[in-house]
């Protein structure tokens, strides 16, 4: 069921739809996506059906299908109708006179699965002024979520991180990556005393407050 109230930033939309952030901005700038603004001067945001459109468009083979601006509008409109259906009756949807057949049910399931993982990532992270001065940490620990994501980005093996941070579970590593992609850290990352040492669980005496 379509959530008319829920909106997403371009970074959130990129994670859920599985496309680069620059693609999200291009589809906004060139159409057919029409962003909402929560308030004057705020960042532009997208609706759930827009994420579905991005995921569908990503799956089109550009060697076979080149959509014009009008074609993108028609595809977006068809996707909204399908998305609003409580129980979509068709697995595949014919478009443009039957010349294009899309497996929208599969894409819908993938988008909702990614959205669920994003929600789990959000729920996993806590920002408490009493814990490292409000640094986003993995719930139940004093481990910064951006630190874990950075380790993975720079090639650290999951086994190495799990050995050094025994309180973490493997799923939390994947969720940390998702969170960092959806909510990029602003500004220059802070320096921490354990950056020059192998990955390990930090003690309270080492923790920045």
Question: What does each model-identified segment do?
Answer:
Residues 24-25, 173:
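Helix-turn-helix DNA-binding helix
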Residues 34-59:
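Short helix-start
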Residues 23, 52, 144-147:
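Pre-recognition alpha-helix immediately N-terminal to the DNA-recognition helix
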Residues 7, 21, 30-36, 43:
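Helix-turn-helix-like N-terminal two-helix hairpins of bacterial/phage DNA-binding regulators
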Residues 27-29, 50, 152, 177:
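DNA major-groove recognition helix of helix-turn-helix
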Residues 2-23:
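Polyanion-binding surface elements
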């Amino acid at each position: 069921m379509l959530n008319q109230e829920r909106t997403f930033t371009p970074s959130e939309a990129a994670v859920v739809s599985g496309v680069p952030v620059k693609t999200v901005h291009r589809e906004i700038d060139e159409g057919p996506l029409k962003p909402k603004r929560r308030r004057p001067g705020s960042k532009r945001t997208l609706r759930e059906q827009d994420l579905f459109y991005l995921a569908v468009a990503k799956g089109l083979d550009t060697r076979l299908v080149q959509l014009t601006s009008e074609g993108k509008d028609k595809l977006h409109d068809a996707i909204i109708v399908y998305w609003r259906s409580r129980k979509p009756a068709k697995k595949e949807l014919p478009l443009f006179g039957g010349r294009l057949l899309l497996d929208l049910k599969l894409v819908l399931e993938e988008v909702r699965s990614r959205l669920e993982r994003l929600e789990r990532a959000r729920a996993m992270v806590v920002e408490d002024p009493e814990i490292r001065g409000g640094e986003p940490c993995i719930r139940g620990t004093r481990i910064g979520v951006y630190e874990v994501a950075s380790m993975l980005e720079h090639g650290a093996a999951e086994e190495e991180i799990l050995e050094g941070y025994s309180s973490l579970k493997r799923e939390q590593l994947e969720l940390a990556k998702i969170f960092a992609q959806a909510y990029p850290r602003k500004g220059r990352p802070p320096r921490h005393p354990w950056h020059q040492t192998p990955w390990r669980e930090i003690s309270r005496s080492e923790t920045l407050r």
